[in-house]
């Protein structure tokens, strides 16, 4: 029996070896299954069947087979994790890989793939770096393409920059490099990388003569879509829309690419071209896309669709899309859109409660700035229940919002320059107007505390921070304007100390230093007069602003060259070459032609004799103790008693109704005129005789002559 057993097993393995050499995966599955039926503990047969199921892409059958044999599954941990990865069970795949030895390069590479699909791009980047450093095979270019894809995803979705010093040769790697530059906001480098990727792709495709035009377009479709996205970023939406439409008409085999193009078309259309947008939304909502897109991409697509429904007043569809987003992840954009929808329905209280519930679930640095700022805006504008005011906010609301921001915002947001200026404005608003809830000194105390805490926060981070220098300047100017001279002087002293410590840029800081010293003198003058006088000595005073003759320039501006000649006053000779130029340019040239005192070869300026002071001539009716008429210095037409030049209107014909005179009966000529006899009844109805034709002609001729 033992010899028969050995013989049967040996022949079975021989058949299995032949099937493996021929890559007949169905035959491998049958033979290894027969071996495991008779000999359940055969590890080699078990491994062969698992690999054959993977090669045949029967991942569900493979995973169920592994679960039925938990004892032998410990020998194929990597294969089990790969099957779970292909079935999009990423969490289970990550747990399976934790029990595998981490030093194995293939395990590290699979871990990088799993982390990349889960959205942990930094972890995937670290694993891929290790694999590339330790591997020496023919797949280095593929790994470089994967590395650039990871760096591009990190820059696009997380706004983080990973060091990428690679020069991929494959067009896939060049395409990923273009996406990396796009994530960093550099459209120029992205366009250049896309050009390189397209040229490399065309060169590779030209080597295959059997390639059809459809297959060529399918390979170039991702590059064209990315180029259209750059056009869309540059506000060239019509050109981008044409590219998206052409890619969709070609019907690429990648559903994720079609979904991205359709989503971008919806963004371009907004609330226009509703029929086309509905078709694109349907294309971007096909089944299976959740496994081909990142979670950030899926969320953005759903929010864009909800925005389209919101613009077109389809509130039920908008709510359904937002509900789908909330089931996957809690997105701040989706939450803001839900609050906007409630405000549109005039449910302001529900919108406030929705935002407050989000803030209560998150604390610390996890809070996005959009949610608390939106809540602050609602509380600031809310006048009563479910009503938002449009005028100036109430001081009570301003004080409550300022205190709310201090309680809910994390440190890095509460001390940002924008939030600091907002808090200062709110405290000033709380102490202004008739309904002020606190006095101006109390508000200034709170403002000073805000400024001091913010400056202390940046001092701990490092005084070389640019934001710290910006805050010192602006806070000092504000405090000096509000009368807080002592604190303003302290801030100016700190800024001067920072400038003096920076020796490298001494020439650039000299002018800034003079400005700060001037501000410091203003601050000292309000509480320490001797110190202000001492600080004034460090200011660099100029002896003269210009070498030009100020009196000549003033008279030239006031009277002009012709008036000076007419009055007999001396004027500078004009150059004939400057006839066509303006008077201002001629004056500039005259100033530039004057030699400066610093030039050793310049001729000395001849001093002109001083003019005699004109004797004061007082008017004849001058009275020493009486205030003169203030209108005497105004032009004649601007004086209060000026009525203009009167005209003789006695012979001018009167036009229109001239009013009624009380004594009109005295001047009525009809009263004093004799009475006219009224004709009898028979003659009253008679008509005048008709004129003859000859009389009419004579009358017409007479009119012509009169003309």
From Swiss-Prot:
Keyword Methyltransferase carried by entry: no
Region (Disordered): 564-707
Biased composition (Polar residues): 684-695
GO cellular component: endoplasmic reticulum; signal recognition particle, endoplasmic reticulum targeting
Subcellular location: Cytoplasm; Endoplasmic reticulum
Signal peptide positions on this chain: none
Alphabetized Pfam families for the sequence: SRP72, SRP_TPR_like
Gene Ontology MF terms: 7S RNA binding; ribosome binding
Function: Component of the signal recognition particle (SRP) complex, a ribonucleoprotein complex that mediates the cotranslational targeting of secretory and membrane proteins to the endoplasmic reticulum (ER). The SRP complex interacts with the signal sequence in nascent secretory and membrane proteins and directs them to the membrane of the ER. The SRP complex targets the ribosome-nascent chain complex to the SRP receptor (SR), which is anchored in the ER, where SR compaction and GTPase rearrangement drive cotranslational protein translocation into the ER.
Subunit (UniProt): Component of a signal recognition particle (SRP) complex that consists of a 7SL RNA molecule of 300 nucleotides and six protein subunits: SRP72, SRP68, SRP54, SRP19, SRP14 and SRP9.
Family label: Belongs to the SRP72 family.
Protein name, per record: Signal recognition particle subunit SRP72
Organism name: Schistosoma mansoni
Gene this protein is translated from: SRP72
